[in-house]
């Protein structure tokens, strides 16, 4: 993509069948941006990357743009394998710890009742929501026990280049995109996508959330970027 920036694509077992991940050269090692979900196929894909693309250097840092399973799922495995730290916003880290250990907010009876109260009455659809009680924990069975916090406006030095964190809301609790002036790149995660609409939802955990306003307001944070910035989306 650019000097020191490699584009990886890994499969997902959904209708949205892939995720774009990023490998950034970082001095004597590599920084991974986003992880893929926890399954054997994704682990095998990463092992192929480790065998062919690292040039003998280790992974020294894992960054997750946000807590969703396709972005954070394998963070525990990657950080344990390479004995490195996870970098993520505090809000998403703690939300992931909660979601991976409970059935809150992503499916089950409470979610079905919440959606029914807003007009979802189709029995088949409600049955699917009830069946998702273990949805998040199934793809994020573990979250690293420690992390380093990403903050809005924070500059992260990766390979001698400054990458600025841009917080976004509405899609995830506290999503962090990464923008590099020198390379004219924006790793947008799920906040800016080229073809599909970003998932902007309200869950039973925060029933009065105004997620759409949060998301639309967040988009204004990208308006100052130069027109020639290359956007690297997750899907």
Annotate each PLM feature:
Residues 1-4, 158-162:
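Conserved N-terminal entry element of GNAT/NAT acetyltransferase domains
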Residues 2-57, 84, 178-188:
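Conserved beta-strand hairpin/beta-sheet module of binuclear metal-dependent hydrolase folds
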Residues 9-12, 71, 167:
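Conserved HGGG/HGGXW glycine-rich cap/lid loop of the alpha/beta-hydrolase fold
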Residues 18-20, 98-102, 198-200:
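Short aromatic-enriched loop/helix-cap "lid" or pocket-rim segments at secondary-structure transitions
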Residues 30-40, 136-147, 155, 162-234:
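Metallo-beta-lactamase
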Residues 41, 51-157, 184:
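Active-site HxH/HxHxD metal-binding segment of metal-dependent hydrolases
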Residues 46, 234-235:
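Adenylate-forming
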Residues 46-49, 74, 218:
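A general structural detector for well-ordered alpha-helical segments in enzyme core domains, enriched
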């Amino acid at each position: 993509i650019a000097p020191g920036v490699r584009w990886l694509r890994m499969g997902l077992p959904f209708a949205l069948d892939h995720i774009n991940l990023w490998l950034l050269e970082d001095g004597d090692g590599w920084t991974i941006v986003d992880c893929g979900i926890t399954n054997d196929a994704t682990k095998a894909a990463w092992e192929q990357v480790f065998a062919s693309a690292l040039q003998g250097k280790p992974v020294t840092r894992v960054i997750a743009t946000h807590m969703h399973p396709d972005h954070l799922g394998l963070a525990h495995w990657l950080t344990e394998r390479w004995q490195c730290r996870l970098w993520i916003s505090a809000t998403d880290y703690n939300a992931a710890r909660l979601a991976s250990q409970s059935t809150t907010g992503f499916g089950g009876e409470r979610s079905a009742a919440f959606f029914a109260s807003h007009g979802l009455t189709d029995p088949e659809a409600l049955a699917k929501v009830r069946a998702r009680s273990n949805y998040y924990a199934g793809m994020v069975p573990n979250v690293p026990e420690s992390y380093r916090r990403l903050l809005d406006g924070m500059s992260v030095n990766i390979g001698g280049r400054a990458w600025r964190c841009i917080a976004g809301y509405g899609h995830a609790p506290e999503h962090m995109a990464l923008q590099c002036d020198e390379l004219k790149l924006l790793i947008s995660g799920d906040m800016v996508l080229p073809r599909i609409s970003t998932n902007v939802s309200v869950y039973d955990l925060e029933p009065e959330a105004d997620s759409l306003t949060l998301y639309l307001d967040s988009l204004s944070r990208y308006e100052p970027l130069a027109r020639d910035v290359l956007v690297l989306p997750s899907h």
